[in-house]
Structure formats: structure tokens, C-alpha cells
């Protein structure tokens, strides 16, 4: 086993025995095999398109789902990977039979999970390239594609698809075995950022088209007496279906982690039993889930090894999987609802205060004139985008301290689960504009980009010339894809922490520093001084 795709990788170098995330050696090898077979499918699909042979939507969806399922904290169940690998291989072979071009050696996949795992040992990420810098760039591309695939899959579930984006994903996968130089691979990394921008745009259209544009909404952090279901992950459609199926049952629905922004969507917040938010970010789930007196539903990624005390109360859906945890399909949450009815629920109302969400692009741009006026009058001196992934590794209290120490004439924009380091801080407002604006989930980086571009247009300058600084935290591969999007857009001076990716070599890092002035975080005091002067 060798895996270094997440920020918490062992010793800052790579996991070699078992993943810090909980991934076993066997699952790691199966995922490596799946990536290899997807790379082969990408090669064949790209050749097919060049020859005018149609690639079906089924193959496109299979590709996005397959790539997404290898992202950190999505699927830990080796048996669930067996049909995925076989379906990808079958799709590859069916297309290959129609293609005249030589697509290289195609891996004949084995039968059982154990056999597939053994087979996967031949395809570690270290085999991407003998040259460590070229391998680093190929890893950046593949990890970026995992983020692209996640957003592409989410968007497709909501009916938003783009055949050109699927074609680009296939072509990017086909790059892995090719002998390319630094310049070409850097170009592909930037292309991945462009692809991710499109994927986030599709997902934004899917979310807002189905559920309306988020509006500023107060969300209780306490509880309401009664039966309860907790929804974690990122999937709005799963939440909507659960809300419909629990209407009139007396069960209250709570969000966890990155589901918090769902409270701002008009078509979700209209349900009276959609009550509040429970807990914080993904890495605290063992403690928080153990104390939740109802059923728990994990959508998309961010699952950790369930503790025995709640293993019987937690369910997965979509691409999420953990061995021994009940998986529900087709949007039928009857089992989850039955479990919630069986469990005690909250005994009494509790008041733990409230937080504000719903400051996506439509809301912020709706008060753009007030924001611009505030900047011109000197009331708002600077904007900070402080967001990204949260995690368990020490050093992430930097983000709490940074936000608390930011001057009163600055505005904090935030998104993704990194916000939980400070989401409940009372920072006040500037001329009626809250100083802490929650833009949404990680994919709502699209909203943040639209806000930045609109402000740049209003001030007739480039985004890099705005009084805006990005202080980002990363953990998994969606953060890689978002970073590549920002670099594709030419955004510079990004501060990144709590540590730099293990898969970035010194030479590749030097390129990023020289061209984009990416820098690691230092201390809140030093960074604020450097930014504000």
C-alpha cells in the first residue's frame, strides 16, 4: 500500500500499512486497480471519440462515479468495488472492440474482491511515472479529477450534464500513461481546473434550479424534543427526498457538516420539520454521532469508521460505503425512518444559539451596491476568503485565531467544512452586512468566484487587484480541484495550510511559488500583518 492523496497522510509522506482515514491495505489496492481500469477506459473512450464512435451516457456516468468512489472517505467497502470495476472493464472492452487505434494493454480484471485487491498491488500511484516531478504532476491531475468527478456526479444526479466535460475527463485520464514533459503536464493540471469550474457551474445550476437560490437564514444549533434524523455529506437531493418521506411523521431533520448550507435553500427550508444543525465537521463524527439520539444518514463522502455505539443507527446511500453498515438505494429511506422511530430522539428542547447561512452569490450580489459603497467609504478595508476542508491534524486552530484577530473593518467569506473552526463566532456587521458570510458548501467556491469577478468588474480591476486575500485549508481531493480552478483563473497569493500536499515535489512547489506565489500559512499575526501591512 502507498497512498498520499489526503492532508493527514502518515508522517506527512504516505500511508503504507493502513490509511489514516481508515482505509485498509486491501481497499487501497482495489482503488488503485479501479483507477488503472478507468485510465484505460479514458484512453479507449478518447480514441473512440476521435474516430467518431459515440460514447454512451452510461459510460460517462460510470466514469464519474468510478473516479469519485476513490476519493478520500467515500467507500471503504471492498465488496462494493467489485461490480464497479467489472462494469468499468466491460464498458472499456465494449468500446475497444469498435476502435481501430492501438489503446495499449488492457488489464483483464479478476473475479473476487480478494483477487482484485491482489491484482491492484501492481498499480500503485508510484507507478504513474519514474520521474518524481512528472509523477507529482500526474498525481495532481488524477487527484484533481477526483474532485471534478465528485461535482460532475452530483450535477448529473440533478439532471445537469455536459458531454464535452465527460470527454475532457476521459482525455485527462488517458494522460496518465503518456510520456509527457513538465510543461504539458502543468497544462493538463490547469485544464483540470477549467474542467472543475464547469463541473461546479453545472452543480450550481442543478442546486439552484431545483431548490432555488439560497437566502440568508438563521439556523438553530440546539434541538427540538422528538424523534430525529441527522443528514451528513453533501447531497441535496437525498435530503429533499428524506424531507418528503418524513413529512407528517413527527421526525425532525437535522444537518451535519457540509449539509448546513441546505437550510438556506427555499425549496428545502419550507419543510417545517427541517429544524436545525447538529455538530461540526466530519472529523468529529465519532463523538457527535455517538451522542445523537436518532438515525444518521451519510450521503456522498466524509464517513469515518463507525463506533459500535451507533453502528446500528447509521446508514449510507449513493457512493458511500462502510463494511457492515446498511446501504439504502433508490432514494427509499424507509429503513432510516423506521430506525428513527425506534430510537428515543431528543427528550427536551435545547437552545445552543443560532448561526447564519445562505450568503451565496445571488444574495451577496444582491447587496453589491452596499458592499461597493462600504469599500469606497473605507468602512470595509479588506475581504478574506477563509475556508476549505477541516481535519483532525494539529495546526488548524490557526484558522480560528485568524478570523478572531481579523480587524473589525474586514469581512470574512467562508465555505466548506473549514468554517466549523469559527462558524458560531459573533463578529458583528458593517453597515448591516454581517462580517461573517457563509457562502455554502465546498462546491460553492463557484459562488465565491462569481462574487470576486463581479467585485473586480465593479472596481474595474483584476481579481488579484481586489482587497481580497484567500487563506485556504485542504484535506482531500475536492480541495485540489478547487485550487486548480483558482490557478486556472490566474489567482495569486493564496495561502494554503495546515501543511502542503505530500504529493507535491520541491520542483513542482517551486513552479507554483514562482508562477502563482502560493505560500504556506505561518501564524495568524504574521499573515495578517503581511496582508494588511
Swiss-Prot record:
Q: What class of enzyme is it?
A: oxidoreductase
Where in the cell is the protein located? Cytoplasm
- Required cofactor names: [4Fe-4S] cluster; hybrid [4Fe-2O-2S] cluster
UniProt GO molecular function: 4 iron, 4 sulfur cluster binding; hydroxylamine reductase activity; metal ion binding; peroxidase activity
Coarse class of the protein's main subcellular location = cytoplasm
Q: Which domain of life is it from?
A: Bacteria
Task: Tell me which residues bind [4Fe-4S] cluster.
Answer: 3, 6, 15, 21
Recorded family membership = Belongs to the HCP family.
- The protein in question is named Hydroxylamine reductase
* Biological source species: Maridesulfovibrio salexigens (strain ATCC 14822 / DSM 2638 / NCIMB 8403 / VKM B-1763)
Amino acid at each position: 500500500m502507498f497512498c498520499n492523496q489526503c492532508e493527514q497522510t502518515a508522517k506527512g509522506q504516505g500511508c503504507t500499512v493502513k490509511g489514516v482515514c481508515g482505509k485498509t491495505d486491501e481497499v487501497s489496492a482495489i482503488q488503485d486497480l479501479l483507477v488503472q481500469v478507468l485510465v484505460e477506459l479514458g484512453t479507449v473512450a478518447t480514441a473512440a471519440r476521435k474516430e467518431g464512435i459515440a460514447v454512451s451516457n452510461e459510460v460517462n456516468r460510470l466514469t464519474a462515479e468510478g473516479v469519485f468512489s476513490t476519493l478520500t472517505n467515500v467507500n471503504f467497502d471492498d465488496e462494493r468495488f467489485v461490480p464497479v470495476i467489472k462494469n468499468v472493464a466491460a464498458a472499456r472492452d465494449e468500446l475497444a472492440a469498435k476502435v481501430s487505434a492501438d489503446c495499449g494493454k488492457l488489464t483483464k480484471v479478476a473475479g473476487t474482491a480478494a483477487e482484485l485487491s491482489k491484482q491492484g498491488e501492481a498499480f500503485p500511484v508510484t507507478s504513474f511515472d519514474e520521474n518524481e516531478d512528472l509523477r507529482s504532476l500526474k498525481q495532481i491531475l488524477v487527484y484533481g479529477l477526483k474532485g471534478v468527478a465528485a461535482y460532475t456526479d452530483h450535477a448529473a444526479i440533478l439532471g445537469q450534464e455536459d458531454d464535452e466535460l465527460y470527454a475532457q475527463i476521459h482525455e485527462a485520464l488517458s494522460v496518465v500513461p503518456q510520456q509527457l514533459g513538465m510543461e504539458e503536464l502543468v497544462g493538463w493540471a490547469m485544464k483540470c481546473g477549467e474542467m472543475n469550474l464547469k463541473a461546479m457551474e453545472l452543480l450550481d445550476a442543478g442546486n439552484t434550479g431545483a431548490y432555488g437560490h439560497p437566502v440568508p437564514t438563521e439556523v438553530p444549533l440546539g434541538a427540538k424534543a422528538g424523534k430525529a434524523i441527522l443528514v451528513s455529506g453533501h447531497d441535496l437531493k437525498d435530503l429533499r427526498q428524506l424531507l418528503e418521506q418524513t413529512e407528517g411523521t413527527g421526525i425532525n431533520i437535522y444537518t451535519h457538516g457540509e449539509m448546513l448550507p441546505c437550510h438556506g435553500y427555499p425549496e428545502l427550508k419550507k419543510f417545517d420539520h427541517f429544524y436545525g444543525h447538529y455538530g461540526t465537521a466530519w472529523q468529529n463524527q465519532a463523538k457527535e454521532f455517538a451522542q445523537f439520539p436518532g438515525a444518521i444518514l451519510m450521503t456522498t463522502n466524509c464517513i469515518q469508521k463507525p463506533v459500535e455505539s451507533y453502528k446500528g443507527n447509521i446508514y449510507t446511500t449513493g457512493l458511500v460505503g462502510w463494511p457492515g453498515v446498511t446501504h439504502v438505494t433508490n432514494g427509499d429511506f424507509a429503513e432510516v425512518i423506521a430506525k428513527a422511530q425506534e430510537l428515543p430522539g431528543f427528550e427536551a428542547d435545547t437552545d445552543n444559539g443560532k448561526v447564519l447561512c445562505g450568503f451565496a452569490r445571488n444574495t451577496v450580489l444582491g447587496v453589491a451596491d452596499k458592499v461597493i459603497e462600504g469599500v469606497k467609504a473605507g468602512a470595509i478595508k479588506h475581504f478574506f476568503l477563509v475556508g476549505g476542508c477541516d481535519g483532525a491534524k494539529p495546526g488548524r486552530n490557526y484558522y480560528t485565531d485568524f478570523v478572531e484577530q481579523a480587524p473589525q473593518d474586514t469581512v470574512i467569506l467562508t465555505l466548506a467544512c473549514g468554517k466549523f473552526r469559527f462558524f458560531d463566532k459573533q463578529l458583528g456587521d458593517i453597515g448591516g452586512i454581517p462580517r461573517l458570510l457563509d457562502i455554502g458548501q465546498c462546491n460553492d467556491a463557484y459562488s465565491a468566484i462569481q462574487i470576486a469577478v463581479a467585485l473586480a468588474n465593479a472596481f474595474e480591476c483584476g481579481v488579484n487587484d481586489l482587497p481580497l486575500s484567500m487563506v485556504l485549508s485542504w484535506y482531500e481531493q475536492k480541495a485540489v480541484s478547487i485550487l486548480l480552478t483558482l490557478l486556472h483563473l490566474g489567482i495569486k497569493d493564496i495561502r494554503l495550510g495546515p501543511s502542503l500536499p505530500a504529493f507535491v515535489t520541491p520542483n513542482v512547489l517551486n513552479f507554483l511559488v514562482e508562477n502563482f506565489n502560493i505560500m504556506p500559512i505561518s501564524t495568524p499575526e504574521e499573515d495578517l500583518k503581511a496582508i494588511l501591512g
